[in-house]
C-alpha cells in the first residue's frame, strides 16, 4: 500500500513524498500506523497523542477523514488512497 505524506512529515521519512507498506486483508488504520512507526520511529511523536491519532494530524482514507469514520479501527480496503497531513499554516 502506498501512503502519501505531506509537509513536515516528509523529512521524518527521508524526504519521501510517499512510502510503501506491506498490508493484508483486514488491516486497519492502527495496523498501518504501527507499520509506519516501526519503519520510521520519528513519526510516533507526530502521529499519536495518548494512544490515538493526534488531534493535529489528519488521516484521509479515500478522501474521507478517518476520525469521522471508525478511526483507528477502520479497515483499509484494497487499492485504498491513504494520505496523512500534519498541521499546515500560512497567510499574512
Give residue spans per PLM region.
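Ubiquitin-like/PB1-type beta-grasp interaction modules and other compact soluble beta-rich domains
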Residues: 1-92
